[in-house]
Amino acid sequence: MLSRNVYSRLSSVLFKTRYFSIACDHIGLNKLGINKPEVIHHNLSYPELLRHEQKNKEGTLMKCKYGDTFSIDTGKFTGRSPKDKWIVKQVDSESDSNIWWGNVNKPINPEIFEDLYTKAITHFNSLDECYVFDGFCGASSQSQKKVRFVHELAWQQHFVSNMFIRPKNKSELYNFRPDFTIINACSVVNQDWEKQGLNSEVAIAFNLEKKVAVILGTWYGGENKKGIFSLMNYWLPLEGTMSMHCSANVGQ
């Protein structure tokens, strides 16, 4: 049964520049501990993503009135899992004093995060290929952030390509240094959650000091988007800007 929660319009404005598949060290994945995948598909165009989605049998191409749509099944999660969202509480850090800790912003210690991070990295080091999207959140140059997503599924790259601002050309990717990276190991189930004192086998965990987050155990694409939006809601007020719950990836 096809899930109703992700319908990525292929009739969107196409990003026609082709970016070639590259190695881990070329874009700095090795600094995250990801060394194994021999092929990194970097900022693929929509037609290229569709070819990968179909080759990987990740969903179904549907003919719709307003253009072709690729429909996928996200499993048991058709929405976010807010009770599984965690933030590293680093004593005496900047984030420790700025975050409103409670039932929404729930703390975990750095050791638990490192365990979750290791599970994600170990998974990607077992793959032959993966997908990387580099882009921007926020249209204003004054508040715009560089974001990177590392995925095992082409459709999740498709999703973030729709949600975030794509680079206009290769020059914007030259020496790209993300302000934050999300590593989405959606197929990895955290079987140690009870021992760690977490809510379930799903984990969406952020380390603001290390500028990285990991997603485990949920295929729901919205966790990618909401993760960065949550970070913007943290960063922007500290920069003197009121944050709003809205976005656009195409002007006009």
Model-derived features with residue positions:
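N-terminal mitochondrial targeting presequence
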Residues: 1-25
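A noncatalytic interaction/capping subdomain that flanks phosphate/NTP-handling catalytic cores
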Residues: 21-251
